[in-house]
Amino acid sequence: MIETLTKNKITKWLNIKPSTFDPKPGLFHYRHENGDEKSRIHLRLDPDGHGTLIVNANQVMHLNPTAALMAYLVLEKKSEKEIIKIVRKAYSVTKEEVLTDLQTLNFQLDQLIRPDGACPVHELELEINMPFSARPTAPYRMDLALTYKCNNDCAHCYNARERTFPSLKVDEWKIILDKTWDLGIPHIVFTGGEPTLMEFLPELIAHAESNGQITGLNTNARRLADKNYLDKLVSAGLDHVQITV
């Protein structure tokens, strides 16, 4: 995971929350598709105006209020004219300053979003934050242990609870998924035990997908040998799989 802070002239303006056009704090989800390129983007806006841009759940960019506002406007596909008007009103800067920084930000966002885009450290001149140098307003990812049951009996298992430990019902898990979204958590990983033993797993994946969350699965992969079952998970919206043996 790369943690960066956008570095351009706009960050030299006042590092304060804009006085006008105040988007509500929350988590916003966007999809980028261009030919064979596909990316999922999350922008988390904090109450103090700062933001966090997360690309494909594996690149994290910390944004000050000015950069967060501009990123929000760009991702919301506001026109150049609208963006210039809003930013000028919020920060009392010239049209030329906004236009210059908008062009820089557009280029940076385009490269960050593309799977084969420029390296954010060596090619985009982004500043690096040291790990754990800042406390995020919410986790970037939440792992949910759906069950502690397993269809293996490994001597090296790290499962901390008894296999008979009760699980929650599907509607209870959906409430938890909704709460994680409301908290600003964009990435969910279903784990266990063996999560594929829970027949409602595809339903939970689909629910998280409808929220806008990226979903992953930690599994021993035994049930994934069933192509019909695997297709069901993919159709529900599963994004990635980690096989643990």
Can you say where each PLM-predicted feature lies in the sequence?
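Short linear motifs at secondary-structure transitions and domain/linker junctions
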Residues: K17-T20, L27-R31, G35-S39, D46-D48, ...
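Acidic, low-complexity/disordered tracts enriched in E/D and polar residues
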Residues: M1-Y72
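A generic short-segment signal for beta-strand/edge and adjacent turn/coil regions
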Residues: F21-P25, Y30-R31, K38-H42, L109-P115, ...
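Conserved phosphate-donor/acceptor-positioning beta-strand/loop module used by diverse small-molecule
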Residues: I243
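Conserved alpha-helical substructure of the radical SAM core
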Residues: T100, T104, Q108, E123-H240
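Long, charge-rich, low-complexity alpha-helical segments
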Residues: I2-L14, Q59-D143
